Amino acid sequence: MRAALSMALSALLMATALSGCSGISGIVGGSDSVEVPTWEIGDWWLYTFSTPDYTDDTARLVVASVSEEDNTSYLLAISSLTEARRHAVLNHNPFLGRMTQEDLSAYENGEAQTVMDFPLEEDKTWGFTLFSIEWSASVWGISGNSVTMGANADDGSHLEYVYDGDVGFFSAFVWTDASGVQQMRMMLADSGGGHSGDVYFVRGGDLYSDVWEDTGPDIEVRDTFFVSDHPSDGEWDEMIYFLDAECGGGSSTISLTLRDHGSLSALERVWGPGASESGTLGTIP
């Protein structure tokens, strides 16, 4: 009988808290160019996030710092701790974390990626890497302070996004893969300044990911991975795991055990015949 298990694990440094603080249509005509905005601590944008693997989630992106990278970058955090943890494991939202002040460039694998090349001008073209995909981007049109952009990849994937100068960030951002599935959709619901409340950004490291699949009646898989301290902040605060599991019928079962170096069980899960689970996100202190 078929038994399959896939799991991704990540050990995480911290949740940084700050207290007190549909399709896209092209547009043409309008201003010659749109300049990069200046953000302040507490500026916020309320988005609805949609992906094929999860239910829609609405959360605020909030400017938590304006002094990252020697005062050259902002830090964007989020009001949902679950979304912050998911991003740490899956790189779910590229606009969480550091963004440059010069171009609002998002960081991927430690490198700033110019998703928007300010000043934004009609027919301007540039390239960047996002979601580990290389994109060729261009400005489709400008109308007042609203700029519609698109980007294409060699595999047929495409991005469509709109920058709204009146709010200082995206009003929409959609990533569609080569098969036509929208892998990520961000739609702006509201925006403002002076956010009050906790926001989070979780820094992840020591990422471990693997997939096990077997159609035989019995299989045992053992694997080992090592977790080191963060290079500047010492021990991690927690481990976050993300898993999918699917068990065949008949007498099939799946048993998952995660042990530490002292053989203490940190996580134990069992699935019986026909059981399945998808997109589970959990934490281990």
Regions inferred by a protein language model and the residue ranges of each:
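Surface-exposed loop/edge segments in extracytoplasmic proteins
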Residues: D56-D57, H87, Y208-D210, G262-G272
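Acidic, serine/threonine-rich low-complexity disordered tracts
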Residues: I24-R85, P94, D103-R222
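Positively charged n-region of N-terminal signal peptides that target proteins for export
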Residues: M1-M7
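Cysteine-clustered segments with highest specificity for TGF-beta superfamily mature ligands
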Residues: I284-P285
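Bacterial Sec-type N-terminal signal peptides, specifically the leucine/valine-rich hydrophobic h-region
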Residues: A15-L18
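Acidic, Ser/Thr/Pro-rich low-complexity intrinsically disordered segments
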Residues: D218-S276
